[in-house]
Amino acid sequence: MTENEIRDLLFNNHKEDLHTLIIQMREPLALPQDTFPSIAQLLQNRTETKINAMVENLETLRLDGKEVRLVRDSDTTTRIDLLGSIADSGDLVIIELKKSGQTERQAFTELLGYANHFCTLFPPLSESSLQSILIAPMEGRGVRDALAQELIINEKNALALIPKIVGEKIELEAYYPSELYYRWVENNVLDDSSMTVVTASFPIIEGWIDAGE
């Protein structure tokens, strides 16, 4: 099944029920009850909760267009694979589809660019009202790193779904960043180079500080 066939299948057959194709969602990481959670655990819980919330929002998604052209001043015509809206909130959903793992990193970069472009076209629109979805194998380290960066650090509404072709049908597996990414962020936050310690000394001021304590 080619990219165009997948796009047409989603638009023609799942215009209002794309969420039913999503599989293998997971429960967010449970935080420890007897100890204070680590930074990595807090980030993983928050991110996985956000991913699940974005998937749940798709229950009222309606796909409104395919190969939607973006008007630009250059000769190159840019098209969005699928464009939709969420009935409950009115948020826009931009979907980019790449079947090949070789081009998925570029596709994700373009997807983020489309979101910025919409905000430029409609100044009252903010990125919090946009949801960007990449349907791709998520095989490359580059695209996995980029998605983790946007989700964990930049707090973007970005979601990745891995297509699973079964005959003439398709399933979309929800992608969750590996716990290694959260550990990496934690290690960088707590790294010595990320911290600055300042000490200050001053003479005792009568009546201000009790020097006897």
Regions picked out by a protein language model, each given a short descriptive name:
Residues 1-213:
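Charged, terminal alpha-helix-loop-beta segments
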